[in-house]
Amino acid sequence: MNLLVTGGAGFIGSNFIRHVLLTRGDTRILNFDKLTYAGNPESLRDLAADPRYDFVRGDINDRAAVADIFKRGFDALVNFAAETHVDRSIEDAATFLHTNVSGTQCLLEAARAARLPRFVHISTDEVYGSAPAGSSFTEETVLDPRSPYAASKASADHFVSAYANTYGVSAIILRCTNNYGPFQFPEKLIPLMIANAQEDKPLPIYGDGLQERDWLFVEDYCRAIVLTLESGTTGEVYNVSAGSPQPNLTIVKTILKHLGKPESLMQYVKDRPGHDRRYALDSSKIRRQLGWKPQVSFEEGIRRTIDWYLSNSAWLDHARSGEYQTYYDRHYTNRSTTFSG
């Protein structure tokens, strides 16, 4: 297979590329990535010498560059390219509209023109909004995005569906719960808490910390993407989840326990505007139709994740250089504190 991956220098994209090259020996991958703040070439440095892997720096909104890339001929595209952090979308919604909506449409148009055999679009559970206690969203749930980020991803999903229905683009949408694992940018909850705890810095927790998220180890998600790529049904949406939502506070306490750090490091800060209370997905469709199920328990996954960050301090230091500290101070250091753990 000749595979185009957009946004492959980010967290899930880089893990996916590594997973495919390790498990699909006959696959060639071109990674097309703009290398924004969260796109880290260090995440794929060990693959630079692999003849099956190629990298081109570029913007999915650059229609000429995208058209030129498509001339190489691909069997499929997996689109990870996106702005993904909710806090940043609250500050700058226009960037999310430009990248996540306009950029996706640009890729869809190129795929239509090239008659691409397969287009897999990576979406998010956040398009559904906040799930009531005891309920789980199915693929038929009406979308109800609550943040600019979620709205941009929901809009992109609608464009993917529209191109499939109107132009016959062979597209599939994947909506997954929160991922965690190696190479995740430290603005996200789990790597942020690991990094701060290791340095005995305060661990900022939004509101009461009881927001529930369903955490899936990134390796399990990569397997789901490969299955969808190879066996998924065109035009379908597949939810992907571990099926066991946990409060953020429980996650933070688990990290502190693994690191042998006190809960007094926890610091409760003013909650995010419009913060969804709970995400939960029903993933029975992909389990039933494609035979997927998670293989890594949260206990194993969080241990592997913590060990990876502790063993890769140089990668973490690189990720936290540049504008990261300014962002961190704006969102956490200068955010009003409610009380400490």
Give residue ranges: language-model regions.
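N-terminal Rossmann-like NAD(P)+-binding domain of SDR-like oxidoreductases, especially those catalyzing
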Residues: 1-179, 304, 309-312, 318-341
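C-terminal substrate-binding subdomain of Rossmann-fold SDR/epimerase-dehydratase oxidoreductases
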Residues: 4, 16, 58, 191, ...
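Residues that form or flank phosphate/diphosphate-binding pockets in enzymes
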Residues: 12, 38-39, 64, 184, ...
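Residue-level signature of the cytosolic catalytic core of signaling kinases
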Residues: 40, 49, 133, 182-186, ...
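Short aromatic-enriched loop/helix-cap "lid" or pocket-rim segments at secondary-structure transitions
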Residues: 41-44, 131-134, 184-187, 251-252, ...
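Proline-centered turn/helix-capping motifs that create local helix->coil transitions or kinks
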Residues: 120, 129-133, 168, 184, ...
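The catalytic Tyr-centered alpha-helix of NAD(P)H-dependent dehydrogenases
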Residues: 145-152, 176, 182, 186, ...
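Hydrophobic alpha-helix immediately C-terminal to the catalytic Tyr-X-X-X-Lys motif of short-chain
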Residues: 155, 159, 163, 193, ...
